[in-house]
Amino acid sequence: MDDLTLPEVETVRKRIETATKEEAKFCLMAAYLFCARASEIIGATNSYDIAHNQTVARGPTGQDVKLETFEIGDIKSEAAIFTVRTAKRDGKIRKIALPLEKKFEPWTEQLYNYYLEHGNDKVFPFTRQKAWDYAQDTFAGLSYPIEKYSMYDPDDPKPKPVRAHMKPFRTHALRHLRATELIETFGFTGFDLSVYGGWTLRSMVGVGSSMSRYAHLDWRRYFPKLLKKRF
């Protein structure tokens, strides 16, 4: 049976860096760094989704980023603040802050400059199908684990178990990989992850409902944890 583990972060990053098309590289780079769903990145909605009232494109324009300075105690660091409109939450805005220094995150400056090139236009002016195609080409041969679960048929009250298995590595797997990295490498708590990745607080293990009043807190809460030299 296949090893039910995610690919190494370094393996995935190398694949992204060597993507053949520039827009593919930066699209996948943003999806990974932002812990984003595909619809939070892409700027166009396909005809099927429109007709069936499905996923709405919420992708950014080149104006959806700015630079700020983070200061606390002896720590002073420049950050690029990216605006992400959260899918499944009516486009609720969340801010993704990434260190500008390459020793903390070598992709931040590249992505920031790519945004600026697009001005008022959409940064990724294509549909999620194209994003999936880019992921399919870029991550060919990679897979990620799906834990066992139960399927429910409205015509059959008895749940049908589905065994743990592997799926081809695509855009949604980037979200899983980044979330795992934020927890295991950077020490994010469930609350930090809900603020960063746009999950509802009640969906995060270990985050009580009483914490919901603080969900508006911005990037300054989690940003110091990203100031960890890795590269």
Task: List where the protein language model places each region.
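Residue-level marker of regulatory loop/turn positions in helix-turn-helix DNA-binding domains and
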Residues: 19-20, 30, 163, 167, ...
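Basic, alpha-helical nucleic-acid-contacting "clamp/cap" segments
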Residues: 62-126
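Catalytic-site neighborhood detector that most strongly recognizes the C-terminal catalytic loop/helix
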Residues: 197-231
